[in-house]
Amino acid sequence: MLLAVLGSMGTLAQAQVSDAAPKFVERMADRALLERVRQGGYVLYLRHGTTDNSRADQVPLGDFKDCSRQRVLNEEGRQLAVQVGQFIRQARIPVSQVLHSPLCRARDTAQLAFAQQPGGLQQVDGLLYTANLTQAEKQPVLKVTRQWLSEPVSRGSNRVIVAHAPNMADLIGYFVHPEGTVVIVQPQGQGQFAYVASIPPKLWPSLLAP
């Protein structure tokens, strides 16, 4: 009897494991994908540059422009932001729109990476960092994040979103790492999008090599 009970418990445990959501699998971009991105129609979700982890965001943030209350880019992060922008231009990836979170680290990354962007940059307050929010507070932020990830992009151009790792983790279980990583997404409309691949900073040189 005891063996039968233990056996049924084991079967139940296996069923629970099999019913669990599949673990997210990160894929690295290759040159073939880069060629497709040059044709446009994608969203590039860029996690901000390297930050000073000795400074945590103060909650509530209050004024988004007050960088003294936020975790901000360090010098390495500022250089990384410039470098990622250069990589994107060297890859001849057309960018028609750059949106960024209102937090200083995302805003500064966008300004450093896309300083010469035609039409300028657009701050979207709804792209807030979600890690410090309650589940109820997260919902409108995730709705906005999903909206811009899923909104179709015209052929011949791409949309860039400069934001945070927790937002993507909340949406698809993918905590974007390291900082400065570009996540390539295929927007599908009506709130739907598909993860395609990632480009961490160290991958760019091999993608761009002759």
Describe the role of every protein-language-model region:
Residues 143-153:
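A short, acidic, amphipathic alpha-helical segment used as a generic capping/interface helix at domain edges
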Residues 1-8:
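Bacterial N-terminal signal peptides
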Residues 135-143:
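Short, surface-exposed amphipathic charged segments that create phosphate/polyanion-binding patches used
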Residues 41-43, 154-163:
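Generic beta-sheet signal
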Residues 91-93, 152-156:
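Glycine-rich phosphate-binding loop signature in dinucleotide/nucleotide-binding domains
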Residues 46-51, 161-168:
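Histidine-centered catalytic micro-motifs
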Residues 16-125, 130-133, 174-184, 188-210:
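Active-site-proximal alpha-helix that buttresses catalytic centers in soluble enzyme cores
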Residues 11-15:
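Sec/Tat signal peptide C-region and signal peptidase I cleavage site
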